[in-house]
């Protein structure tokens, strides 16, 4: 499956050979002090720098050392922008091939497996994640997630180690791989009769996957806290007042332990950052809905959620927010109903 999917990915997402570094690529590679080995930065120092090569006290909160390791390695060979873009396309094809294998292991239907890989390789959720150089973080994070799904087919004694390694790989590629922590155990619960029809042991496999994914998350946070000691956000550095409810105090303590670097509030880059919570949720639901429609009907592509593509909404209830909420709720509920039936 890898070869034909690679051809399709190349046809759909390859930029012109004369392409240059555009938008964030200039900051990620040309101005990245780690990639350019400025200031005596060693190869291993990626663990002490953020995605843009900045130290903890200047970071915007993106801790992704694995893409930096890859960039530094390839940068020593070539600085040609087309090459750095092209291997991103090939990684996307590799993800599609791996998803094809996972689908076949689950269904034993070759045609359906090829269809899943074809849909995945042709309908990237974000074109920027495949055709843009900085999208390597998304692609590698996706590789970790799909590899974790593939690990569920391993014997019970080996599966936790595979899930642990895959989730850890995804987390060090991009923070959004955090979604694997709850989703992979859920997938283990659902897929156990398909991957191990003679001895499904749903609860045991799901618990093992949860322990493995949770251990990967804890190790990731502890290593990031030690290797990348970023400043504590002001809202977390301030102690909670006396009488704070236990649930809120527990959430505060969890966020302090997680120690996410302060995120920038730039309305031009992310207009939802200055919106209140209800309007932020409504705007996020609209982003989700538009992303889904762009996958199926890519008439007008929006590279990201920055202004003016996705300005903060002026009301809470509108078609985009309602459709986004419906598409978040209905597919899981429908899948659950089909599973029970």
Spans of model-derived segments:
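Polytopic membrane enzymes that build or remodel cell-surface glycoconjugates and lipids
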Residues: 1-341
